[in-house]
Amino acid sequence: MSQTSNITNINELKNVLEVALLTSQAPLSLDDMTRLFSDRMERATLRMLLDELKQDWANRANPTMELVQVASGYRFQARPEYGVFLARLNPEKQAKYSRAVMETLAIIAYRQPVTRGDIEEIRGVAVNPNVMRQLQERDWIDVVGQRDVPGRPSLYATTKNFLDDLNLRSLAELPPMEDFAQQEIPLDT
């Protein structure tokens, strides 16, 4: 590869994107990736290169990794069928979440922004502060403002990290509420 940052060869452009995505600790946004190149790249061109890179990896014999888009951007990750093997590297127990935590998270995800009072009204019971703290420590929810009523209660909404952990690009990709209530969705830690 040439030493200049002005690359015109499509394969070299894809190689730069590939190495940046493979070595990044977190998903890269389109803005992050445009900064890789001295001449600002059009978003349409960048998306085309990412689509080609995704296809390149999918077309490999026995692909082990895949390029995915999540709420925070793009990242490479192991294909799901290799998860059981990778879990052996970190034999920590999968976190178990109480019914209260899962119900609270579901209410926030589907009805956001909501106050604790809204959650309590929907669930019919008081929300334990530890439930909210656990979801905030996990970086799945955050305070996004206050409702303009007496007492100005905090409004909670899900975070990009919540979407990233579920491999979702947006809340629109959540299953319909009816489906969610009928199935168990495993949440990796």
Show where each model-derived region lies:
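A short, conserved structural fragment
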Residues: 54-67, 139-148
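Short capping segments at the starts of secondary-structure elements
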Residues: 20-29, 41, 110-115
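Short, cationic-aromatic polyanion-contact patches
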Residues: 68-89, 145-168
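Short acidic, hydrophobic short linear motifs in intrinsically disordered regions
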Residues: 27-36, 113-123
